[in-house]
């Protein structure tokens, strides 16, 4: 058996991988084991009771985390005229249309989120091969293709995250940083879980929230007692 590193050994002493922890305790343990020299992200993995092979059971959407993400988000907006002015007023970092498309084609992508007004999709649609693989392609399902670009910009800046099930039916998301308080992380997690519950596909059968675990970038992971989510 391979010898554990000092960090891994310390984590193994604190977190029992076979145990289900109440959500507050799980988050506290993950924070305690996030000892890297940078502010580690706190992540969550949620196993949903869906069939990921069926398109009508895929779960995708977005939610604004009440305590934010702890990250400064740069937002690019495809808009023109009054919508472009509204996007700038809302705090968008880059606003344009054909000029923005040319920047992206040239590999200049100094942004984290792309928002588009519906009337610009004729231009944005041609960028799918560039934006798609990076998870940046605007999509109405997550609120990034919308006539109300100003609200979309404000949401992105306020800590909106996007989520979608992977091939195994698992949602992966970041709910904050190790520097956040447990209550902040708990509130963010509650907002995500609430959004997932509301996005439950009609075709999904049986238990919907199957498993949930929280972890940090370099630290340990703790499994969460599902019942404790509704007890808080």
Swiss-Prot record:
GO CC annotation: cytosolic large ribosomal subunit
The keyword rRNA-binding appears for this protein: yes
Keywords noted in UniProt: Repressor, Ribonucleoprotein, Ribosomal protein, RNA-binding, rRNA-binding, Translation regulation, tRNA-binding
UniProt cross-references to InterPro entries, sorted A to Z: Ribosom_uL1_bac-type, Ribosomal_uL1, Ribosomal_uL1-like, Ribosomal_uL1/biogenesis, Ribosomal_uL1_3-a/b-sand, Ribosomal_uL1_CS
GO MF, one annotated term: rRNA binding
PROSITE patterns found in the cross-reference section: RIBOSOMAL_L1
A GO BP annotation: regulation of translation
RNA-binding listed as a keyword: yes
Pfam families, per database record: Ribosomal_L1
Superkingdom: Bacteria
Function according to Swiss-Prot or TrEMBL: Binds directly to 23S rRNA. The L1 stalk is quite mobile in the ribosome, and is involved in E site tRNA release. Protein L1 is also a translational repressor protein, it controls the translation of the L11 operon by binding to its mRNA.
UniProt subunit comment: Part of the 50S ribosomal subunit.
Family note: Belongs to the universal ribosomal protein uL1 family.
Protein name in UniProt: Large ribosomal subunit protein uL1
Organism: Bordetella pertussis (strain Tohama I / ATCC BAA-589 / NCTC 13251)
